[in-house]
Amino acid sequence: MSNGLRTSFERISLFHPQGFISESSAEFCCSAPSNLSPKFPMDHWERTSSFSPRCRHPDLRVRLQSSPPRGPQSDRNLPSLQPLELHGDRPGLCDVHETLQVQKIGLRQSKLLRTSKLPSHRGRFRSIPLHLHLSSEVRNRFHARCPDVLQPLSDTRPLHSVPLSSEAPLQSSCSPRKLLHRPLSPPKPLHLHNFRQHSSLCSRRSPCRKLRPTPRCNQLAQAQQHPLPSSKPLSLQAGILGPCPLPPHNKRSPSPAVIRKTAGILPHPKLPPSSRGHLPSSTSSSSPRSNRGVRCSVHLHKSRSNSQDLRSCRVRSNSLQQTPILMGHFKSLGQSPNLRSFERPRPTRRSLRLLPLSPQKVPTVHVPTHQQSGHKGPSLPRPHSPSRQTHHARLPHSKRVSLPNSVLHHDRPKRPIHFGSFPINVAPSHLLPRKLWSRASSPPTCSPTTSNHGHPEEALRFLPKNLPQHCQMALMENYCSHFSSPSSSVSFPEDHQSSLPPISTRWVQCSSPSFSLQSFLVIGDIPCPISFPLSSPQSHSSESLRGDSPPSSHLPSSPSSACSGDSFASCSSFGPSNPTSSASALGGNHFNFSFFS
């Protein structure tokens, strides 16, 4: 450097203590200019320069570093290598004139910047002019960095006293700042446009009513026992990219499309049969936790032997029923496993209706007449049900027989029934001697050529055990005569038809179960009064319809009951409470009859 101080040394100087360079370094002294002092201080450990700023030069450096400082050091506190400063006057340093100009630029840059003033605030700080006279109190309130800004004054004003009221205020759920800055205002009605003034413009529109908003009220304290329904969490709400694909928890309600099919369910009959080629025949039972995860696709590798472990969780054991389920057919899940037959409820007391049968469809029963000269044909001494329809009873066998058309509701019978009391001097039939009973009605024997249906032993199965012997004989006679001579018809004597006055037909109803009905049977020339209590229809309605026991078991075993041996109608007096008791004596045939009085 031509116009500067030469700093190139031929050899490195030795170590010297801090502060000065030794005089023994003759080589350094010889190479140095003559105007330099032989002893000049080095950089101090506190980084304070002892040289004048005008003698500094960046190229004038000592290649020997100073000793480490006594204080603690760090990476940021290393001793800097300051350039050497020269002593002497300025005219003797003509070679370092450029060094002074460089130093001036460094001093301008190294000047510390002043601290910036804090901005003045209307509510917190108050600025005052400096030319005003300030008292000692005001001087103490000066800001530390801003002398023209005063510190805030303490507000010593008294607080407003709030009168205490007896009523406790309502507890609000929002913060108190919102209540202070949000004054409550009374609701204002919302006025809409009056369409009635312009009715021609909108004639078909109905007039609008005046809407008023709901008055706003403070929210009361929430009860802990009845909390309000929690809102939807923030994680489940829809954002910019839309709602989340899956909820964060696993406890979610299963969708109706994913329904597990149980074993043993029949496939839907309307669906076509599925193919079985692309699905395996059977799979291993999966764990119950496999259905909770996400369904995986089917990846089958032909080269691997354990390809069954890579099947999807939706592949079921029955491959025929798997395809409709994967295609989304909800009806293919089958029907209910409850395949029991429908059980019809048992009929109630009033649900069984006995309808009449037309005489054209039902064959007529031909009962042979075995009457003597003085025998009178009795009628059926039993009451009728409240309904005015003719009763017919369905018995176990399939045959149907009915009484002649003259006995039905079209023609009046030749011998009607009279309900009432007869003279006491008439002897009942059970008090007559055996000889008189045999003379009055001698029961004929059954024909030996009768079939198995007309056998007397078959009729005994349907008769109660507590009947008298003469009643059993009369029932057997009528049963055998029905199959022995089917061509005969029922005939009634006409001697009583002219003697009895014409009486209109009436129906007798059983109002109470304790009502006793007294009738009579004509045995020969002696009318025999019989009396028996009428039982309520509730006592036998359930048992007679079930068919658990023969209906003839409900016949009353009264010693005063008597029966004639001429016709089938005389045997029905033993069952006044059961409409099927008289018909069950013929082995379960179907009868149709009506009663007149």
Curated annotation (Swiss-Prot):
InterPro entries assigned: 45/70kDa_tymovirus (IPR004935)
Skewed-composition ranges (Polar residues): 64-80, 218-234, 305-315, 575-584
Protein name: 66 kDa protein
Compositional bias (Low complexity): 273-291, 535-574
Sequence segments annotated as region (Disordered): 62-82, 160-198, 218-315, 329-411, 535-586
Top-rank taxon: Viruses
Composition bias type Basic residues, residue spans: 389-400
Family: Belongs to the tymoviridae protein p69 family.
Pfam families: Tymo_45kd_70kd
